[in-house]
Design a protein with these regions (language model features):
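A conserved active-site cap/scaffold subdomain adjacent to cofactor or substrate pockets
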Residues: 235-270, 274, 279-340
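Short beta-alpha connecting loops at secondary-structure transitions
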Residues: 20-24, 69-71, 279-299, 321-336, ...
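Long, amphipathic alpha-helical stalk/connector segments used for oligomerization, subunit docking
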Residues: 303-389, 395
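Alpha-helical transition-metal enzyme core signature, strongest for iron centers
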Residues: 78-81, 92, 128, 132-135, ...
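Glycine-rich cofactor-pocket loops
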Residues: 140-162, 272-288, 321-329, 353-373
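A helix-coil-helix interface module used to build multimeric assemblies
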Residues: 1-202, 207-218, 281-282, 292-296, ...
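Active-site-adjacent "gating/activation" loops or surface patches in catalytic cores
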Residues: 209-234
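Active/binding-pocket-proximal capping segment
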Residues: 272, 395-401
């Protein structure tokens, strides 16, 4: 690997081999050649003067791309598609004269992009399901484990660790639903000609529109698409790119939210992401256990959310047909969006697969604040015993402020002692201690977790079947 030129960190550090291969020059230009073969085959089968031998020769040279020839030709003609038509013709000379017959550049560029994007989305779906399976197992394990809740990042009523995980998982489920919609609604461009009129193919087939439709149907089916866009210009509608980057951005939003929560919880040592035996947290502070994976998820997710802004700007400025100035943006923003989403989900898998809960710290943190959280129940019990609700509310406020001030000086919380010593409440310390059971304050968290997981089982069953250790 050369070290004297820039290389995107998405390629060198973060993305998977699958995604790197999917958006590689080999995959892109081989897909172009597959499209040229499919076009020639359909034209031959529908009666155009193309021989089976020409089709076979094209098919025999899909993978042996001479990049040196193509690059030299592009330098001369300044056109990538025509450069590859030329290189393909050199490899398959008997078919050189019929390559790209009737087509325009977007026949190969746009249809190839749609194939790669669809395959990329399907791969990301698998990665997303894996994250959800991990979270489902984690949520089930800790469905009933109380933990301190937060609002405004201030202590609030308890929840359970599993309930918190289902909130993350619910975001990812929303992404999965959106992803399935985008994949299911993808269409092929087909053979549309320079402005989408199919005029060149109408001419080739001597006005037989049915043959043009059949040609499009056959080529689309060969690449796994059931339908083509009903109408288009030379390019497929760039709103499709917006849909794709929007769903990738949505995944990034969910991942960022989860990873940011984990970072906050790791600060208090309640939860920790995986930490390798020989991992170094800081070059200057050897004791550090930085949440590196979660930080990286947030960093890459931020990039992906920003990257998604490219697609709507492209879709909204077509100028009657796509301008070349926009094509350059797409060559960067879409592949990098896929690579970034891949990296984010791989990191999410790593974190959720080894997320560790320090249960003693979770319990200690909750019990530190539990006296304050229990005051509403204490107040209601005191009212039952004849107290005045408004007077008791004020007394609890005063005692709470005093106890908090004491805690700020490093002293333990003495709120329960203060309430036990106040005759307005008429309760002993032993009676107050009995309401300090955390599970009294988690409401229906456990039932909510289990119900949510039951809803998700149909979505996760296929992914979970690959791992017998996961009980859904």
């Amino acid at each position: 690997m050369r070290k004297d030129i820039y290389e995107s960190p998405l390629s060198s550090r973060y993305a998977s081999e699958y995604m790197l291969h999917l958006f590689s020059p080999d995959m892109r230009f081989q897909t172009w050649r597959r499209l040229w073969v499919a076009l020639a085959r359909a034209e031959h089968e529908l009666g155009l003067p193309i021989t089976q031998e020409q089709v076979d020769e094209l098919a025999a040279h899909i993978t042996d791309i001479d990049y040196e020839v193509a690059e030299k030709r592009e330098h001369e003609v300044r056109h990538d598609v025509m450069a590859h038509v030329y290189a393909y013709g050199k490899a398959a000379p008997s078919a050189a004269g019929i390559i790209h017959l009737g087509a325009t550049s977007c026949y190969v560029t746009d249809n190839a992009d749609l194939v790669l994007y669809r395959d990329g989305l399907k791969y990301l779906r698998e990665q997303l399901l894996s994250v959800m399976v991990n979270l489902a197992a984690f949520a089930r394990e800790y469905a009933a484990t109380p933990t301190l809740g937060y609002t405004h990042y201030q202590p609030a009523q308890p929840v359970t660790i599993g309930k918190r995980a289902t909130l993350w998982m619910q975001d990812f489920r929303s992404d999965l639903e959106e992803l399935d919609f985008v994949i299911g609604s993808m269409r092929f461009l087909g053979c549309r000609g320079t402005t989408g009129t199919e005029a060149s193919f109408v001419d080739l087939f001597e006005g037989d529109g049915d043959k043009v439709d059949e040609m499009n149907r056959r080529i689309a089916a060969e690449f796994g698409f059931e339908k083509c866009f009903s109408v288009s210009g030379q390019t497929y509608p760039r709103k499709a790119d917006s849909r794709i980057l929007n769903v990738l951005s949505s995944i990034a939003q969910s991942a960022y939210r989860m990873a940011n929560d984990i970072r906050l919880l790791q600060h208090d040592r309640q939860v920790e992401e995986p930490f390798e035996k020989n991992q170094i947290g800081s070059s200057a502070m050897p004791y550090k256990r930085n949440p590196m994976r979660s930080e990286r998820i947030c960093s890459l997710s931020r990039y992906l959310m920003a990257d998604a802004a490219n697609a709507p700007m492209t879709a909204s400025t077509q100028w009657l047909k796509e301008r070349q100035i926009l094509a350059a943006n797409r060559r960067i923003s879409l592949p990098e969006g896929f690579l970034c989403a891949d990296a984010v989900l791989r990191l999410c898998q790593s974190v959720t697969n080894g997320l560790h809960v320090n249960e003693k710290i979770v319990e200690r943190t909750l019990r530190e604040y539990l006296p304050f959280l229990a005051t509403e129940n204490i107040m209601m019990e005191a009212v039952k015993r004849g107290g005045d609700r408004q007077e008791l509310h004020e007394k609890i406020r005063q005692h709470s402020m005093a106890a908090t001030a004491r805690m700020k000086e490093g002293e333990p919380c003495d709120l329960l002692d203060r309430l036990a010593g106040d005759p307005a409440f008429g309760m002993t310390r032993e009676e107050l201690d009995r309401v300090m059971e955390p599970k009294l304050y988690i409401g229906r968290c456990e039932q909510q977790v289990l119900r949510f997981l039951d809803e998700c089982v149909p979505l996760l069953r296929d992914a979970a079947a690959e791992d017998g250790a996961i009980d859904l």
